[in-house]
């Protein structure tokens, strides 16, 4: 069975969908969820789903090789950033080339980069008068949201859409597409 490790900073709704999806199809298991946020909803979700969850801080991630060594011991087939807000250190990217994927709530390269996450993205998209938005699943590199694009899917922005309504549309895409694309990557 293939092994996934997830990183998440927030609510964990995408992480939960991934765990549930792979429990049903048994191609892979989520061996561990890592979070940098002691108040993240993903902690409660991991507990409820009986998936090991570990909290780490900036020192563990950037100043020591603690997280890198943990990942090397676990030997995941894929590392999935599911709402993880920190930039991944270059030593981890170098050790796991084309094995770290992220999901972003816009059609990159638009509305990507530092500070562009969650509702910030949807507010910027609506403020700019865009007619469509969507999701991008991509490999990560040393720059925010600039890695090779694996998959994109669009949603139409209709007159009167608010950032909150756009967020709902984008979440629906994320929940459906992210596990399927992860599955395809594991099978390739």
What are these regions (language model features)?
Residues 1-188:
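One-carbon transfer enzymes
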């Amino acid at each position: 069975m293939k092994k996934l490790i997830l990183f998440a900073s927030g609510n964990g709704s995408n992480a939960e969908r991934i765990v549930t999806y792979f429990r049903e199809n048994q191609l892979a298991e989520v061996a561990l969820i890592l979070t940098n946020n002691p108040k993240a909803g993903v902690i409660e979700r991991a507990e409820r789903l009986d998936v090991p969850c570990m909290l780490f801080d900036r020192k563990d991630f950037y100043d020591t090789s603690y997280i890198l060594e943990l990942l090397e011991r676990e030997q995941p087939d894929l590392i999935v950033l599911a709402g993880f807000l920190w930039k991944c250190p270059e030593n981890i990217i170098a050790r796991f080339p084309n094995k770290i994927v992220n999901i972003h709530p816009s059609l990159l390269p638009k509305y990507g980069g530092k500070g562009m996450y969650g509702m910030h993205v949807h507010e910027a998209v609506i403020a700019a008068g865009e007619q469509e938005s969507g999701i991008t699943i991509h490999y990560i590199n040393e720059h925010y949201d600039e890695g090779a694009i694996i998959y994109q899917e669009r949603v139409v922005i209709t007159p009167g859409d608010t950032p909150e309504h756009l967020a709902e549309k984008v979440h629906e895409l994320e929940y459906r597409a992210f596990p399927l694309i992860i599955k395809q990557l594991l099978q390739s």
